[in-house]
Curated annotation (Swiss-Prot):
The keyword Coiled coil applies. Residues 251-278, 311-352 form a coiled coil. It comes from Rickettsia bellii (strain RML369-C). This is Putative ankyrin repeat protein RBE_0984. The lineage of its organism: Bacteria, Pseudomonadati, Pseudomonadota, Alphaproteobacteria, Rickettsiales. The keyword Coiled coil applies. Keywords: ANK repeat, Coiled coil, Repeat.
Length: 387
C-alpha cells in the first residue's frame, strides 16, 4: 500500500530501528512510513530496551495507518505476542480495539493464535467485549467462531457487561444473533444497574429478531420470570419487555409471544402459590392440634408447659427442614390423639413418635427434653403406618 516510500539504503538496521522508534514516539507518521520499507520484518517486531515494539508504541501513539503497515509486515507469531511485562495483560488486538482501530483489528483477528485471541486482561476485557463496545461488527463476526465459549461469556469488571449486552447496546443485530446461542444462561438473564434485562433493552431498541431469539432461549432455559420482569426504578419504572414491544411498529408477533409467556408465567406462579399453601397446611393443622393439647394442661399444673411446647415444636421444625412429608406425620399424630384419652399420654406419645422418626434418620437434635416429668401414664402408640 505504501510502496512509493521504498528506497535502497546502506544504513545499518540498528540505526534505522532507533530512528523508527524515535519517529513513532514523536508521532511523525511520514518518517515512520518512509523507514518501514527499508527494514527487515524481524526488525519491525523487535522490542526496544524498555520492552516496547514499534507496533505497541504506534498503538499507544494512536498512529492507525502506521499500525496497519506494521501488522502487514509482521509474522503471525509476532502479532500473537501477549504483553506480560506490563501490569495489565494485553495483546496487540486489545490495544487496537481500545483505540477503536477497525482496520487493524480486522487484519489481526484472523491471524492471531487461539491463546492470544482468547486473552482476558486485568480489567476482564476480551477481544470480543472490546470490539462490541467499540461498535466493530465485522471484527466481532470474525472473532466469535474462533473464541472459546467461556471467554465469550466473560463480563468486564466495571459494569459487568457481557459481549452480548454490548452488542445489543450498539444495535449489532447480526452479532447478537451469533452470540445468543453461545451466551450462558446467567448472562442471558442478567439485570443491569438500571433494572433492565437484555430482552427489555432489545425491545426498547426495536431489535425484532434479537427479541424473538431471546424469548425462545429464555423459554428454553425456563426463565419466564426474566421474560416478564418489570423495571422497578428510573425513567422506565413500570415498563416491561411487553409494554416496550407494544410501542414498536411491526412487533405484533413479538407481543403475541410475550403475552403468551405472561399467561404461562401467571399460571406458573399460581401453581407455586397453591403448592406452598398445600405444604403449609399440614404444619398449620399440626400446630393447632398441639396447641389444643397444651391448652388442656391447666396453667400452673405443670411448670414445664412452655418447655414441652418448645420441645415438640423444635422437633417438627427439624423434620420439616429434612424434607419430611408433614402430611404423613399429621396423619400419625391424629392416630396418637385418637388412641390416647389422657392429655399427658397424648403428649408423651407424640414426642415418642417424633423421636422415633428423628432417630431413624440419625438427626442430631439439640432438643432432647423428655415429657416424662408429666408422670407415669399409660400410652397407646400406633406405628402401623411404618414411619
Amino acid at each position: 500500500m505504501f510502496a512509493f516510500f521504498r528506497s535502497s539504503s546502506n544504513e545499518p538496521d540498528g540505526t534505522l530501528y532507533n530512528k523508527l522508534i524515535e519517529a513513532i514516539k514523536s508521532r511523525n507518521s511520514l518518517e515512520v512510513l518512509a523507514l518501514i520499507p527499508k527494514m527487515k520484518n524481524e526488525e519491525l517486531a523487535k522490542p526496544n530496551i524498555y520492552g516496547n515494539t514499534p507496533l505497541s508504541l504506534a498503538l499507544n501513539k494512536k498512529l492507525e495507518a502506521v499500525c496497519e503497515v506494521l501488522v502487514s509486515r509482521m509474522s503471525d507469531k509476532d502479532i500473537s505476542i501477549i504483553e506480560t511485562y506490563v501490569e495489565h495483560r494485553e495483546t496487540y488486538f486489545t490495544l487496537a480495539a481500545i483505540k477503536g482501530f477497525k482496520g487493524v483489528c480486522e487484519n489481526l483477528a484472523p491471524r492471531m493464535s487461539n491463546e492470544a485471541i482468547n486473552v482476558i486482561n486485568a480489567r476482564k476485557h476480551t477481544a470480543l467485549t472490546l470490539a462490541a463496545d467499540k461498535n466493530l461488527p465485522q471484527v466481532c463476526i470474525k472473532l466469535i467462531p474462533i473464541m472459546f465459549d467461556e471467554v465469550i461469556n466473560v463480563t468486564e469488571n466495571r459494569h459487568k457487561d457481557s459481549a452480548l449486552r454490548k452488542a445489543i447496546w450498539n444495535d449489532l443485530d447480526v452479532v447478537c444473533q451469533m452470540l445468543i446461542p453461545v451466551t450462558s444462561k446467567e448472562n442471558i438473564n442478567y439485570i443491569d444497574v438500571s433494572d433492565r434485562t437484555l430482552l427489555i433493552l432489545a425491545a426498547q431498541k426495536g431489535m425484532k429478531v434479537v427479541c424473538k431469539m431471546l424469548i425462545s432461549r429464555m423459554i428454553e432455559d425456563n426463565s419466564l420470570d426474566i421474560i416478564n420482569h418489570v423495571i422497578s426504578k428510573g425513567e422506565l419504572k413500570g415498563e416491561s419487555a411487553l409494554s416496550l414491544a407494544e410501542k414498536q411498529k411491526g412487533f405484533e408477533d413479538i407481543c403475541e409471544l410475550l403475552q403468551k409467556s405472561h399467561e404461562e408465567y401467571k399460571e406458573q406462579k399460581q401453581k407455586e402459590n397453591e403448592k406452598k399453601c398445600e405444604e403449609s397446611q399440614p404444619k398449620k393443622i399440626i400446630s393447632e392440634d398441639i396447641n389444643k393439647l397444651l391448652n388442656e394442661l391447666k396453667d400452673g399444673a405443670y411448670n414445664n408447659k412452655n418447655i414441652i411446647e418448645f420441645s415438640i415444636s423444635a422437633k417438627i421444625e427439624k423434620l420439616e427442614k429434612n424434607a419430611n412429608d408433614l402430611s404423613e406425620i399429621y396423619t400419625n399424630i391424629q392416630d396418637i390423639i385418637n388412641h390416647n384419652k389422657n392429655t399427658k399420654a397424648k403428649l408423651l406419645a407424640l414426642e415418642k413418635h417424633l423421636n422415633q422418626i428423628i432417630d431413624a434418620q440419625t438427626i442430631n437434635t439439640e432438643q432432647q427434653i423428655s415429657l416424662e416429668a408429666l408422670g407415669d401414664v399409660s400410652v397407646e402408640f400406633s406405628n402401623s403406618r411404618g414411619v
